[in-house]
A protein has these predicted regions:
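Acetyl-CoA-dependent GNAT
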Residues: 4, 8-79, 83-85, 96-98, ...
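Conserved glycine-rich acetyl-CoA-binding loop
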Residues: 61, 80-97, 106, 117-124, ...
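Conserved GNAT acetyl-CoA-binding A-motif
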Residues: 103-115
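Conserved catalytic-core motifs of GNAT/GCN5-like acyltransferases
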Residues: 112-117, 123, 127-143
Length: 143
């Protein structure tokens, strides 16, 4: 069985970041103008502002992504998407686990995320890895 690897952002992966996120947004919500801007220029809107983007690879293919966005007072786990044909391989959990470990290594106090209550499988995953609910956000201390 092939392993899932987590790799950092490189400009050559910007299109996959866009495609994975747009696919997810179109399935559950819609792509807002601000989303379009951020997803089209992730280096400008995330990396250059002190954030991080990671990708999950499986069988030498980019199959998932996640961003840690610098919100000045905290880091926000955001823009997480996994290609539907790779659901069930726990790639989302691997991306989140990687981000939590990354935050620990950086000695961050916490990572925050925002989610929609209708995304029940995602909410369950967030709780499973230690995020705690509040209204309207889920947040987690980095243990």
């Amino acid at each position: 069985m092939l392993e899932v690897s987590i790799i950092p952002f490189e400009e050559k992966y910007a299109k996959q970041f866009y495609n994975l996120n747009v696919e997810w947004l179109e399935k559950y919500f819609y792509v807002e103008p601000y989303d379009q801007k951020v997803l089209s220029s992730p280096k400008t809107y995330i990396i250059d502002k002190g954030g991080f983007i990671f990708f999950a690879t499986y069988n030498n293919e980019i199959v998932g992504t996640v961003a840690l966005i610098n919100q000045q007072q905290f880091y926000e786990l955001s823009k997480m998407a996994v290609s539907p044909k790779y659901h069930g391989l726990k790639i989302g959990q691997k991306l989140i686990d990687y981000c939590i470990q990354f935050g620990k290594e950086k000695k961050w106090d916490s990572i925050t995320l925002y989610s929609n209550r209708k995304l029940v499988p995602a909410i369950n995953l967030y709780k499973k890895v230690g995020f705690v609910g509040s209204t309207p956000i889920l947040g987690s201390a980095v243990p």
